[in-house]
């Protein structure tokens, strides 16, 4: 399912009514996607969106709790539910599911993820499962392949989606698991890709407005 721009526009419109300025945050792995959606909102509404990106979503939510001003959050629903934070989110809009994507470096002739267990792939990477939803999805996918499909010496865990993508683009690893946005942004720099829709828990994206923080309700002075 494609990410629903209309749903994000609705969330940003609500935020623009509740706050003086729309300020958007997300984790590093979703930054490019969030930028695309914010651009669509600005084109539709004429309102500017301030972008607050940098760390993983846990770090960004901690910044909101400390008063950095972000009032709209984009992330996957599972990660947001797992975070321990005083930030309460309201006006939640579904953006749809987004897939795990297997990519490989230029010059490597692969059919797709089915070649992962062959000698064609000497080493591959995926994001740290403790820090990134795509890392957890990749781990689930690999676990479902069976214990003997991929040897441990092939696997490299890297902090985030952008870093995994960079390793593949530079040829430091043969392949990696990332997201659709990273794949599209680097389509001219990689050898190929395959979207995976099974073998892991669905990654459901949402946009939500910061509704309650330290006793202050959105829209109330």
Regions from the PLM with identified roles:
Residues 2-9, 17:
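Sec-dependent signal peptide recognition
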Residues 11-13, 220:
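Repetitive helical segments and hydrophobic/amphipathic motifs
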Residues 13-14, 43:
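Intrinsically disordered, low-complexity segments
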Residues 14-20:
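Sec/Tat signal peptide C-region and signal peptidase I cleavage site
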Residues 21-46, 50-221:
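Exported/periplasmic ABC-transporter solute-binding proteins
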């Amino acid at each position: 399912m494609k990410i629903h721009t209309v749903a994000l526009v609705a969330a940003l419109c609500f935020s623009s009514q509740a706050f003086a300025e729309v300020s958007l945050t997300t984790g590093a792995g979703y930054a490019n996607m969030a930028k695309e959606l914010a651009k669509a909102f600005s084109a539709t509404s004429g309102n500017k969106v301030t972008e607050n990106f940098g760390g993983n979503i846990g770090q960004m939510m901690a910044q909101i709790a400390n008063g950095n001003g972000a009032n709209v959050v984009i992330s996957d629903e599972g990660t947001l539910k797992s975070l321990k934070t005083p930030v309460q989110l309201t006006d939640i809009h579904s953006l749809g599911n987004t897939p795990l994507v297997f990519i490989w470096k230029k010059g490597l002739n692969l059919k797709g993820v089915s070649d992962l267990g062959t000698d064609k792939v000497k080493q591959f990477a995926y994001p740290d499962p403790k820090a990134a939803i795509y890392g957890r999805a990749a781990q689930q996918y690999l676990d479902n392949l069976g214990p003997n499909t991929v040897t441990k010496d092939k696997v490299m865990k890297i902090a985030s989606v952008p870093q995994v993508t960079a390793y593949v683009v530079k040829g430091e690893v043969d392949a990696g698991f990332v997201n659709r946005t990273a794949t599209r942004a680097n389509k001219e720099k990689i050898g190929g890709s395959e979207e995976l829709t099974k073998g892991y828990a669905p990654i459901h994206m949402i946009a939500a407005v910061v509704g309650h923080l330290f006793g202050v309700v959105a829209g109330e002075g």
